[in-house]
Amino acid sequence: MHLYKPACADIPSPKLGLPKSSESALKCRRHLAVTKPPPQAACWPARPSGAAERKFLEKFLRVHGISLQETTRAETGMAYRNLGKSGLRVSCLGLGTWVTFGGQISDEVAERLMTIAYESGVNLFDTAEVYAAGKAEVILGSIIKKKGWRRSSLVITTKLYWGGKAETERGLSRKHIIEGLKGSLQRLQLEYVDVVFANRPDSNTPMEEIVRAMTHVINQGMAMYWGTSRWSAMEIMEAYSVARQFNMIPPVCEQAEYHLFQREKVEVQLPELYHKIGVGAMTWSPLACGIISGKYGNGVPESSRASLKCYQWLKERIVSEEGRKQQNKLKDLSPIAERLGCTLPQLAVAWCLRNEGVSSVLLGSSTPEQLIENLGAIQVLPKMTSHVVNEIDNILRNKPYSKKDYRS
């Protein structure tokens, strides 16, 4: 049965019922003039203005010993966004642990980096079971425990696929998802992670098994959400369809590479998935493994990542013809950075953030100075006007277009 609740506009004004005779009407008007207006409680109250709503909220919180001025957002200037269409709020800049934790940097430097990030408002810390063969998770968990940060103030994410040498210790089988996540939690010294990612697609495992296993670990309290990494739009859509068909939990986010020279997936494919099924984007490598940092403008320095034996592929990319073209484009972008009063890395990170479809950009830093510089991109973001973005596009000449753009 439909119950009708009248709105304020539906309640007739008392003046509409005045008697027709002038003498009686005059008496009624005199009576109404001294009578208090009807209480508004019977009506749906009008939504208060932003200032009034904030004032009421401040008064309410003050009673409970909480202040709006003492929030992390207000104290640090960090911006927060929803992870896809989920309710999880993540800092728009996160700290990744690939290459650095357990490898390129010492445990002391790792602690310093996490402290700087946390005190700057970063709440998102990303790792994976494969990073430094699990050591990155150990270091991350040890620092969290040592610092005594509230678990509820953190968003910890990890990724599963490569867990060990045995055939059953890799992939996305139900066995490895459950056992792999248990192993990650032990190394992290945590009861749960906020998001567990499938680190790549697994053609050897049926999609239904993957989705069922992810749903299971969430229902068991081992994770809050699950997402994908390096998956195609078609694979993500298949996972969503399977989840809906069998009343299971779909992914909320895709981790994708995104920077000035890698744009199509994040700017064309993922926005369509976001609008259709609510999958957001968490991006990594905003400086293209250091290529955009400017350090490779005159070759490969000895202390750089590209000089390491295991990163010969990066060195080859830098010295290739395409790599030289990219360095020339970066030189053309430098005047824009100077005009905005920022460094080239800050411009590159702010350029990623200007895409509102990106929930968070993962930073990878090997020194405190690098991290502080990259976090400064937050101050550059308001300067990323449409004019500045068009200037950058004119230099890069790689803006992707979707089929919708061609039809319009």
From Swiss-Prot:
Main localization (coarse): cytoplasm
InterPro entries for this protein: K_chnl_volt-dep_bsu_KCNAB, K_chnl_volt-dep_bsu_KCNAB-rel, K_chnl_volt-dep_bsu_KCNAB1, NADP_OxRdtase_dom, NADP_OxRdtase_dom_sf
Family: Belongs to the shaker potassium channel beta subunit family.
Expression tissues: Expression most abundant in aorta. Also high in left ventricle. Also detected in right ventricle, atrium, brain, skeletal muscle and kidney. Not detected in liver.
Catalytic activity annotation: a primary alcohol + NADP(+) = an aldehyde + NADPH + H(+); a secondary alcohol + NADP(+) = a ketone + NADPH + H(+)
Membrane topology: Peripheral membrane protein
Functional description taken from the UniProt entry: Regulatory subunit of the voltage-gated potassium (Kv) Shaker channels composed of pore-forming and potassium-conducting alpha subunits and of regulatory beta subunits. The beta-1/KCNAB1 cytoplasmic subunit mediates closure of delayed rectifier potassium channels by physically obstructing the pore via its N-terminal domain and increases the speed of channel closure for other family members. Promotes the inactivation of Kv1.1/KCNA1, Kv1.2/KCNA2, Kv1.4/KCNA4, Kv1.5/KCNA5 and Kv1.6/KCNA6 alpha subunit-containing channels.
Compartments, as annotated in UniProt: Cytoplasm; Membrane; Cell membrane
Name of this chain's protein: Voltage-gated potassium channel subunit beta-1
Catalytic residues in the record: Y131 (proton donor/acceptor)
